[in-house]
């Protein structure tokens, strides 16, 4: 089953693209089929139907119901990337 993931940032361009590429490669290397949706943080609710994970590169001080939310800045900075990858895999494989 395809896992639907929202990747969001302030402008839906630079940092979300970096995070989306990292997530895509991570999932491909673990044979997890994904559908990635890039958007602005303020557009997340528009795309939430059937979503398994939300990854934001901007700070978000709220929750989205039962959908897990991870902070994707390690994909941009490189700091803490392995821990984030493990967290994402745990969520998607669980």
UniProtKB/Swiss-Prot annotation:
Query: Phosphocysteine modification sites?
Result: 9
- Listed GO MF terms: protein-N(PI)-phosphohistidine-sugar phosphotransferase activity
Describe how expression is induced or repressed: Constitutively expressed.
List UniProt keywords, sorted A-Z: Cytoplasm, Galactitol metabolism, Phosphoprotein, Phosphotransferase system, Sugar transport, Transferase, Transport
PROSITE patterns with a match to the protein in the record? PTS_EIIB_TYPE_2
Catalytic activity as recorded in UniProt: galactitol(out) + N(pros)-phospho-L-histidyl-[protein] = galactitol 1-phosphate(in) + L-histidyl-[protein]
The active site consists of 9 (phosphocysteine intermediate)
Q: Does the keyword S-adenosyl-L-methionine apply?
A: no
* Entry GO CC: cytoplasm
Looking at the record, the residues that make up the PTS EIIB type-2 domain are 1-94
- E.C. no: 2.7.1.200
- What Gene Ontology terms for biological process does this UniProt record contain? galactitol metabolic process; phosphoenolpyruvate-dependent sugar phosphotransferase system
Q: Domain description from the entry?
A: The EIIB domain is phosphorylated by phospho-EIIA on a cysteinyl or histidyl residue, depending on the transported sugar. Then, it transfers the phosphoryl group to the sugar substrate concomitantly with the sugar uptake processed by the EIIC domain.
The protein's matches in NCBIfam families, at most eight in alphabetical order, are given as: PRK10310.1 (NF007643)
Q: What does this protein do?
A: The phosphoenolpyruvate-dependent sugar phosphotransferase system (PTS), a major carbohydrate active transport system, catalyzes the phosphorylation of incoming sugar substrates concomitant with their translocation across the cell membrane. The enzyme II complex composed of GatA, GatB and GatC is involved in galactitol transport.
Q: What name does UniProt use for this protein?
A: PTS system galactitol-specific EIIB component
Q: Which organism is it from?
A: Escherichia coli O6:H1 (strain CFT073 / ATCC 700928 / UPEC)
């Amino acid at each position: 089953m395809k896992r639907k993931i929202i990747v969001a940032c302030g402008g839906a361009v630079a940092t979300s693209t970096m995070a989306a590429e990292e997530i895509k490669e991570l999932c491909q290397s673990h044979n997890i089929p994904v559908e990635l949706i890039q958007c602005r943080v303020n557009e997340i609710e528009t795309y939430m139907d059937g979503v398994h994970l939300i990854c934001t590169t901007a700070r978000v001080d709220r929750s989205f119901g039962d959908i897990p939310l991870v902070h994707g800045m390690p994909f941009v900075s490189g700091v803490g990337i392995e821990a984030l990858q493990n967290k994402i895999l745990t969520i998607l494989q669980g």
